[in-house]
Regions:
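Active-site nucleophile-adjacent alpha helix/oxyanion-hole segment immediately C-terminal to the catalytic cysteine
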Residues: 2-108
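Conserved active-site-adjacent core of cysteine acyl-enzyme catalytic domains
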Residues: 4-5, 14-17, 22-25, 84-231, ...
Length: 237
């Protein structure tokens, strides 16, 4: 085992132990979640740094039919039709989301840790954005970053399945043995496999439980699961 991976395992286990000492938190149902067949193909991230932002936009589309209709058709009640092509409208929304998640203040106006856009979207910024905008949850539903220890991937898989089983879409950070490098959005799953939206292709990918456990995902060229962003059973103040 590489030294960096050994240190990562140790750090992840310490974080998980700290989380385990907190009061038990239960996933809440997703009252706004639509059916997963509403996930339309062809929603591709506009550049190589916006996979997380694309997942945020698609999660909100799944939870907000008016927002999804506007992105798909440019039409929304009470407003002039947006003339941009669907691909351009989606790309612009993703890029605007990326700016919002990476600046010094978030969607709520509260200060946050800025993050270089060239490095993508930090997990904590993605969690904050979902807490404020809701995604497939009601706005104000707290989200937190689940650290996926290489020694406890099975537990993390069960947590993700539990969340999607309640109607939530779950962002999943994947990468190599050294770093997280990409984000996909898990939109369905069971004990055997997960179904995820991959913004690199704009289409669905299947992640088997065995591949998740072994760190052999083969998702957009990446193998290791690193973080999942999941809702918890309370609302933000």
């Amino acid at each position: 085992m590489r030294l960096l991976e050994h240190l990562w395992v140790l750090a992840a286990d310490l974080v998980r132990a700290a989380i385990a000492r907190r009061p038990h938190q239960v996933f809440v149902p997703a009252p706004l979640a639509s059916t997963r067949r509403d996930l339309h193909a062809g929603l591709v991230q506009p550049d190589r740094t916006t996979c997380g932002s694309a997942c945020l936009v698609v999660a909100r589309m799944l939870g907000d039919r008016d927002y999804a209709r506007w992105l798909e058709t440019g039409e929304v009640a009470g407003r002039t039709r947006d003339p941009r092509p669907r691909r351009r409208r989606f790309a612009d929304e993703v890029l605007a989301t990326h700016v919002r998640t990476n600046r010094w203040y978030g969607a709520s106006g509260a200060r946050q840790v800025a993050w270089p856009r060239a490095l993508g979207t930090a997990p904590w910024a993605l969690a904050h954005e979902l807490t404020v905008t809701g995604g497939t949850s009601a706005p104000g539903t707290r989200h937190h970053v689940l650290v996926i220890s290489p020694r406890r991937r099975g537990e993390a898989y069960d947590d993700v399945v539990g969340a999607v089983g309640r109607g939530h879409a779950v962002p999943l950070y994947v990468g190599n043995r050294t770093l997280p490098r990409h984000v996909v959005l898990v939109v369905g799953g069971d004990d055997a496999a997960l179904t995820a939206y991959d913004p690199a292709s704009g289409g669905p990918v299947t992640i088997t439980r065995d591949a998740f456990d072994r760190g052999a995902l083969r998702v957009a060229g990446w193998s290791e699961p690193w973080f999942a962003v999941v809702p918890v059973g309370r609302t933000a103040d």
